[in-house]
Design a protein with these regions (language model features):
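Membrane-embedded alpha-helical bundles of multi-pass transporters/translocases
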Residues: 1-526
């Protein structure tokens, strides 16, 4: 199991890395075309609303509820029941999504008024956002069904297809920048059209792979009388688990919506600065955090179904050690290289040096909470695998309250940076609550060696950070440099930083290869 877990994590991380690279190219194209203008703010709000719902309704809450229930059916081995469950699930989930999509398109003016009330004072920006939202909202319908397909693949430990599917969104938006923006009257509408097309393409892409898995079923709203009770019971259980999970998995996204709402009252560009800095913070979060969470949820669900309580705890411990080993130095690197990263990736065309300065400040604030964002992704499945979606909800409610209070306190003094900082603090609170919740219940028992590992990784990260800081220079030097010089300089810093970090770890006695398998955790310092 442990070798399969490691292999699956590497596969998902590799595919996600490719997806994030294409995402960076996409954002470079967006920065060059719209920068942090009114058009950019309008598109980012129009895209954030369905994307927010997709993350909590499609990928987050649905996966948290669907995977444990479906994994149990898979383990039972009844093929007829499995297909009947999928057919009923697809039919009812699809109807709910269709209804929400229609409501969203009709209620677009109200949604923009709620999410970005600051736009009401600028009628052109408000109307443009509404028009763009009516094109982007159907993306929710398509991509939530894609999330169901991903749940099927992940439950069978087939992670490659769902991990690479997001690339299609990036390619669609790049195509929109290249071919639609030049011929359409408004860039925001052109980009919104690209989002709509991306949703349909992503769903179509999944179909042949579902057929190969013998999981491509015709959606149904009812099942035969003989299957009715057990199948409907399982489908209803998914929706029951999903209701509290809707809130529990969405706290980070709700916090970002609060940021968008408050940022809409700030100077033009604030929404965009938060978007660009969030995108950079999401790179390590997606490549490692979400990839790891994707892999361990079905693993934990099967271990729970097999009542493997010891292995359940060991799997969580294995994941947390890798979070510390990879994410802590990534967080330090993001803080030290915020300016160079933003300059190299985005500072072209409409994206100005001022935008670099403002976005780098919020990136540092987001990076402070990066390890907490990843820990949440890893620990929440510890509850979801046990079909407990209510406990994470309570913790998420507390964290969201912390974010709301801090956002209101900090936004007037620190503007968009205060909003990013509030989000990071809320994530730290949420991660701490999840950790102690699992620990108090005896679900997770840390294995020996944690304090030693924490100290050694912190020292190695600090040494790496000092080397990067001394080699990075000031942001002005990066702004004045050519693209090739920026790329070469940044690549050199990344290679040197990785080398210094690895040498520091080895000098301190940390041997990462001893953490590769679940059975080997706790031996890395031997």
């Amino acid at each position: 199991m442990s070798k399969k877990l490691l292999k699956s994590t590497i596969v998902v991380s590799s595919m996600t890395f490719f997806s994030r690279i294409t995402g960076m190219i996409r954002d470079m194209a967006l920065a060059q075309v719209v920068g942090s203008s009114e058009v950019a703010d309008a598109f980012f709000v129009a895209f954030r609303i369905p994307n927010f719902l997709r993350r909590i309704f499609g990928e987050g809450a649905f996966s948290a509820a669907f995977v444990p229930v479906y994994s149990k059916i898979e383990v039972a081995g009844d093929e007829g029941k499995r297909k009947a469950f999928l057919a009923l699930m697809a039919g009812r989930f699809g109807m709910i999504l269709l209804a929400i999509t229609l409501i969203g398109v009709v209620a677009a003016p109200f949604l923009v008024m709620v999410i970005a009330p600051g736009f009401l004072g600028e009628s052109e920006k408000y109307e443009l956002t509404v028009s763009a939202l009516r094109l982007t909202f159907p993306y929710l319908f398509f991509v939530s069904l894609v999330a169901m397909a991903a749940g099927i693949f992940n439950s069978r430990n087939h992670f490659a297809v769902p991990a690479v599917t997001p690339v299609l969104l990036n390619l669609s938006l790049i195509a929109a920048v290249l071919w639609l923006v030049p011929i359409m009257a408004n860039p925001a509408i052109a980009l919104a059209t690209g989002v709509f097309v991306a949703g349909a393409v992503q769903l179509i892409f999944q179909l042949p792979f579902l057929a190969r898995e013998r999981s491509l079923v015709w959606p149904r709203l009812r099942v035969g009388k003989s299957d009715k009770k057990p199948i409907e019971g399982e489908v209803n259980k998914v929706f029951r688990l999903m209701l509290p999970a809707l809130f529990g998995v969405s706290v980070a996204q709700i916090n970002m919506l609060i940021n968008t709402l408050l940022a809409s009252f700030l100077v033009t560009g604030s929404v965009s600065w938060l978007y660009y800095s969030d995108r950079l913070m999401e790179f390590p979060l997606g490549v490692f955090g979400i990839a790891l969470a994707t892999v361990i949820l079905p693993t934990l669900s099967k271990q729970q179904a097999d009542t493997s309580s010891s292995l359940f705890s060991d799997t969580l411990d294995w994941a947390l050690r890798w979070v510390l080993l990879i994410v802590l130095p990534a967080s330090v690197a993001l803080m030290v290289l915020a300016g160079p990263l933003l300059t190299t990736i985005f500072q072209y065309g409409a994206f100005t040096p001022t935008d670099v300065t403002m976005a780098s400040q919020s990136l540092v604030a987001f990076a402070l909470g990066l390890i907490a964002f990843v820990v949440i992704k890893v620990l929440a499945p510890g509850f979801y695998a046990r079909q407990d979606t209510r406990t994470p909800v309570r913790y998420a409610a507390i964290a969201m309250g912390v974010n709301a209070v801090l956002s209101l306190l900090l936004v007037w003094e620190f503007a968009h940076v205060g909003l990013a900082l509030a989000t990071s603090v809320a994530a730290l609170v949420n991660a701490a609550l999840l950790f102690f919740g699992l620990y108090r219940r005896g679900i997770y028992q840390p294995l020996p060696g944690w304090w030693s590992l924490l100290l050694k990784v912190a020292v190695a990260s600090l040494v790496m950070g000092l080397v990067l800081w001394s080699g990075a220079g000031d942001t002005h030097s990066w702004i004045e440099s050519s693209l090739l010089h920026r790329l070469g300089w940044l690549s050199w810093l990344i290679v040197v930083g990785l080398g210094v970090y690895m040498v520091s770890l080895l000098s301190l006695g940390v041997k990462p290869w001893k953490m590769m398998l679940v059975e080997k955790i706790g031996e890395e310092g031997d």
